[in-house]
């Protein structure tokens, strides 16, 4: 059973904040996947990606986080700093699980839809190889986004993932709550310079010319 302490709930709020600032424009739903795998020598590896559905009435499709700089004309390097900060927050969540004596999860799926914030914790034994990453990505995309495999390779990937999965004895667990804050929309450009990872990071959206909004990271020592 999950022990969602006050600190963990505060981290949930920070995760939401970083997600909202990393997704430009208006959107209806979002799904995020992240894995964190411990290696020897305190080395960690893993991956993170998310997809969101833009709001609109015309035919739509999910947009991948790594497509954002090109689709929204955002400077890629600066945008990826925001994405890295989001992944760092997920690492803090995992560290807090360890501090509270809970079993450490290997991967999570976060969904935001209909003003609900859901976190699904999974404890599978992950190896972190490129084949595993690819197979799981195709499987996950099919499960959560309902994107059907378009090629024999993708169909094989789903079959391979199911066949090679190394489930933990611990069952998946879930946290479900309302969102903590209103979404920030129409974020156009990003400024993430002059900050250090060791500093406390806060976000501030400020209006600029032509009603543009600039996303700044403010650093407090």
Residue ranges and their predicted role:
Residues 1-70:
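N-terminal "first-domain core" detector
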Residues 3-10, 14, 77, 81-88, ...:
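Alpha-helix boundary/N-cap detector
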Residues 12-14, 84-101, 220:
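Short linear interaction motifs
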Residues 22-23, 100-101, 109-111:
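A general structural signal for short secondary-structure junctions and capping/turn motifs
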Residues 28, 62, 98-105, 119-122, ...:
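Short, solvent-exposed secondary-structure capping/transition elements
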Residues 30-35, 104-111:
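A short glycine-rich, hydrophobically flanked beta-strand micro-motif that places a catalytic Asp/Glu
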Residues 55-92:
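A broadly used, surface-exposed interaction patch
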Residues 114-221:
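Acidic, proline/glycine-rich low-complexity IDRs
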